[in-house]
Amino acid sequence: MLHVSAMSRQPAREAWTVDRLINERSIALGYSLDTSSFGAYTSALNSYLTFCNLHHLPVDPTPDTLSFFVVFLSSHIAPKSVNSYLSGICRQLEPFFPEVRQNRKSLLVSRTVAGCLRRFGTPTKRKAPFSYADLQRVLDSLPSTPSHDDLLFSAILLTGFHALMRLGELVFPDKRVLRNYRKISLRHSVQVSIVPPQFSFFLPSHKGDRTFEGNTIVVQRINRPTDPFSRFLSYLTSRDGLFPLHPELWLTSRGSVPTRHWFISRLRVIFPSKDYAGHSLRSGGATSLAEAGVDLALIQAIGRWSSSAFKIYIRKNPVVLHAALVGRPAHQLLD
């Protein structure tokens, strides 16, 4: 039998009851998945259960049943989305069917997915990235004496573009059940520096933060009319004058955190086309950095991406991007 070493200096701690251990573990498991992800996974499970009921199949996720589900769903939605559905199904059914992940990786299921991608696959339609000309168009549309909400809108737009931020990191979701105050940036975390001219604030949590440590967002002044530094300072002055005691960094004229609908509705006034949306901020900033010759590893770090998937945000054909960087076509030799 193993015993605690006599040299050990373990602090004295009160023992927990079994009920408390179970309760605390349940709470920890609840925090393991974000609310928005839980909603998506539950939706995927509901689709699977509906499929099983419709076809009188057992719920047991065998390779046969999963492959049938893939074929059926791929004829109704984009096959690329089916993989996400399978991930959600595995996450929700694993406590009841421990072998579900192994079945998901089986040759039958993986080949069925590959076949559906080839049979039903369609080109991916991505939102257009913002350019500096687009940003200038937004600023030109603002009145000479902008309101607080005008200042907020421009500050969010320019900050999101230059810091490669997701719109969801700057505003609240439209659904109240998905809103989490632990994810929003607070006013007291803001630091403004004159030398060098830049501002920063703390982002408590984001999609790529696997350790839940948060990140400090830093945005520097640039010599362009679309400089984010001056716009942020103008917004901050207005915000502090109206709501000096409110803790949230981003606040509308009503004293509430802006929602996605609040931002998109203002964006639609300037860009009626649905080619532009929240992703246009992040993809526009990433494309701008790539055009400036910034190393891809640095772009990944600035955007806080946890994998190489960030490359899809650089919305520029590699041939065109190379020509822009070196000033000549890719196959043209130097004279």
Residue spans of the language-model regions?
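Extended, non-catalytic subsegments within catalytic or DNA/protein-binding/adaptor domains
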Residues: M1-D335
